[in-house]
């Protein structure tokens, strides 16, 4: 009854259980302030729940357009960036998509789901892309996916290397899910490159992982094409209301970004020999401490393949980071003594 390919598909899994500290999903450690939640609840009371939301999510698209100084025709929104990636892998002409491992796994996930070949052009030793190689080997690509800052390594990609790929003329999907933490973005290049698509999310810096809201910025032709195949009413009224309210309170987001960056650098200083530079809300660490931390009630992300023996640690609240630092120091001490 069910296609064999689906039964053999490796699903996305996340650790569940009653653990003390969760530092595995790159979420913000901060919930919304109670006063802001009350403000949102007042807005939600005005929604007619018996009515469908706007068919193309225009209220949020217009709010984002104003936020970035763009037109709503340059913006599409979805149920997390994942929904948008699901369509982007199959929208453009070409023989395969390009990914640059180690990187976010959902690009390959959705491509394989739709039977689209994936060409992996690995990151260099320092986790940066080789723009010339990608441009050359990606000549027949339908889309080239680049994450900057990259997940799970945390580094931003050099602008000149990204430009080499853009100059190839192939469609470049630049995933900027963590760009608020780096302060770097290619959004100003949208008007210059018709082949540039930028992915963004409300899940990380905005602290809204629970509402599942992502968006993309691109030229009007690409956005128009996407809305021809997106399901109508794809984003619900509650999600749009919360996202719009957070754009109005971006001062809260900026303060929290500063706190997270400060904590990130504090942890990095403690483990400078074992951690890589990061411009995201997490650290890549060359420590095979996943099982040890789990026994201490701390969940981090265990990595594999090229990053076997590494962990990815989301930056938490100060007390959570204190517990992490303490546990990792104990781990290192046991390694030395053992």
From Swiss-Prot:
Disulfide bonds: none annotated. InterPro entries: Aminotrans_II_pyridoxalP_BS, Aminotransferase_I/II_large, HisP_aminotrans, PyrdxlP-dep_Trfase, PyrdxlP-dep_Trfase_major, PyrdxlP-dep_Trfase_small. The modification N6-(pyridoxal phosphate)lysine is found at residue 204. Its EC number is 2.6.1.9. Its cofactor is pyridoxal 5'-phosphate. One of its GO terms (molecular function) is histidinol-phosphate transaminase activity. The keyword Isomerase does not apply. SUPFAM superfamilies: PLP-dependent transferases. Pathway: Amino-acid biosynthesis; L-histidine biosynthesis; L-histidine from 5-phospho-alpha-D-ribose 1-diphosphate: step 7/9. Gene3D superfamilies: Aspartate Aminotransferase, domain 1, Type I PLP-dependent aspartate aminotransferase-like (Major domain). One of its GO terms (biological process) is L-histidine biosynthetic process. Keywords: Amino-acid biosynthesis, Aminotransferase, Histidine biosynthesis, Pyridoxal phosphate, Transferase. It catalyses: L-histidinol phosphate + 2-oxoglutarate = 3-(imidazol-4-yl)-2-oxopropyl phosphate + L-glutamate. HAMAP family: HisC_aminotrans_2. Belongs to the class-II pyridoxal-phosphate-dependent aminotransferase family. Histidinol-phosphate aminotransferase subfamily. This is Histidinol-phosphate aminotransferase.
């Amino acid at each position: 009854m069910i296609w064999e390919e689906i039964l053999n598909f490796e699903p996305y899994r996340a650790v569940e259980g009653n653990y003390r500290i969760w530092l595995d999903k790159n979420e913000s450690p901060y919930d919304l302030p109670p006063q802001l939640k009350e403000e949102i609840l007042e807005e939600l009371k005005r929604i007619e729940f018996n009515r469908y939301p706007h068919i193309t999510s225009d209220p949020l698209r217009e709010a984002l357009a104003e936020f970035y100084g763009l037109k709503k025709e340059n913006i599409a929104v979805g149920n997390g960036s994942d929904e948008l990636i699901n369509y982007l892998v199959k929208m453009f002409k070409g023989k395969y998509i390009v990914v640059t491992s180690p990187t976010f796994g959902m690009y390959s996930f959705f491509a394989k789901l739709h039977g689209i070949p994936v060409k992996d052009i690995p990151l260099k030793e320092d986790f940066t892309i080789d723009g010339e190689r990608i441009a050359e080997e990606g000549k027949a690509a339908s889309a080239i996916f680049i994450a900057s800052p990259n997940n799970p390594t945390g580094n931003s990609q050099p602008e000149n290397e990204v430009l080499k790929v853009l100059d190839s003329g192939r469609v470049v999907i630049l995933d900027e899910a963590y760009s608020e933490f780096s302060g770097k973005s290619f959004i100003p290049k949208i008007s210059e490159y018709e082949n540039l698509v930028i992915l963004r999310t409300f899940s990380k810096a905005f602290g809204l992982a629970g509402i599942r809201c992502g968006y993309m910025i691109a030229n009007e032709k690409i956005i128009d094409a996407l809305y021809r195949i997106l399901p109508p009413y794809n984003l619900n009224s509650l999600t749009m209301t919360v996202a719009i309210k957070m754009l109005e309170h971006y001062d809260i987001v900026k303060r929290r970004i500063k706190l997270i960056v400060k904590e990130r650098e504090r942890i990095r200083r403690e483990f400078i020999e074992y951690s890589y530079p990061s411009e995201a809300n997490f650290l890549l660490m060359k420590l095979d401490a996943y099982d040890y931390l789990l026994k201490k009630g701390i969940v981090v992300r265990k990595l594999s393949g090229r990053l076997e023996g590494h962990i990815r640690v989301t930056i938490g609240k100060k007390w959570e980071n204190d517990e992490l630092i303490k546990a990792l120091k104990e781990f290192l001490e046991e390694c030395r003594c053992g």
